[in-house]
Design a protein with these regions (language model features):
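Extracytoplasmic cell-surface/polysaccharide-interacting catalytic and binding patches
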Residues: 1-47, 142-161
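Short, flexible, solvent-exposed loop/turn segments with mixed acidic/basic and small polar residues
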Residues: 68-78, 113-116
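Acidic, His- and aromatic-enriched active-site or binding-groove loops in soluble protein domains
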Residues: 73-93
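Catalytic cores and adjacent binding grooves of peptidoglycan-active enzymes
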Residues: 87-161
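Structural recognition of the beta-strand scaffold that forms the well-ordered cores
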Residues: 55-57, 82-86, 124-126
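Extended, low-complexity, intrinsically disordered C-terminal regulatory tails
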Residues: 44-71
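Generic non-transmembrane alpha-helical segments
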Residues: 41-50, 98-102
Length: 161
């Protein structure tokens, strides 16, 4: 099932953990609508900006899958409202800064950020619905959450260093 021009449902439901443990990871119609909203409001604009394919590393998670990986059943992933992703060759911090400045989102987290490894970690972004997004921005280093994104040096719209 095609969710948007560049994204298919399978990209959001595939899970090695679900496969290994025999967990059904199938979203309902409301979850699928939410995934489409994430595509249109977050992923398609990001893909257009950076002109590169996006790799979805985690999308929809059933409650059983959330439990199996130690995530909360109330996670926005369980509602189809969140996505974790990367863009090969683009520092995750650059993607996060662009989303913060240009997209309507509920929560944006630069996950497992390491300033010495710009390709490390990933971007988590969620979308709730127009008018109810919190615009919460966090950085997670693997131990604790900090408000906002790290300060970076920029030149010509690119992260320096």
């Amino acid at each position: 099932m095609q969710l948007s021009k560049h994204f298919k449902l399978i990209e959001f439901t595939k899970s090695m953990t679900a496969t290994r443990k025999g967990i059904k990871n199938e979203p309902g119609s409301g979850d699928i609508k939410n995934l489409g909203d994430v595509c249109y409001e977050i992923l398609e604009p990001v893909r257009a900006k950076f002109e590169k394919p996006i790799t979805v590393t985690s999308g929809y998670r059933s409650e059983a899958l959330c439990e199996a990986i130690g995530s909360k059943k109330t996670s926005q992933h369980a509602k189809g409202q969140a996505v974790d992703f990367e863009i090969s060759g683009v520092p995750n911090i650059q993607v996060a800064y662009w989303i913060q400045a240009n997209c309507d989102f509920d929560q944006l987290i630069l996950e497992f950020y390491d300033p010495d490894d710009p390709a490390g970690g990933w971007v988590h972004c969620s979308y709730s619905e127009k008018g109810s997004n919190r615009k919460q921005v966090l950085t997670y280093d693997g131990k604790s959450y900090e408000d906002g994104l790290p300060d970076m040096e920029w030149k010509d719209g690119q992260v320096v260093g």
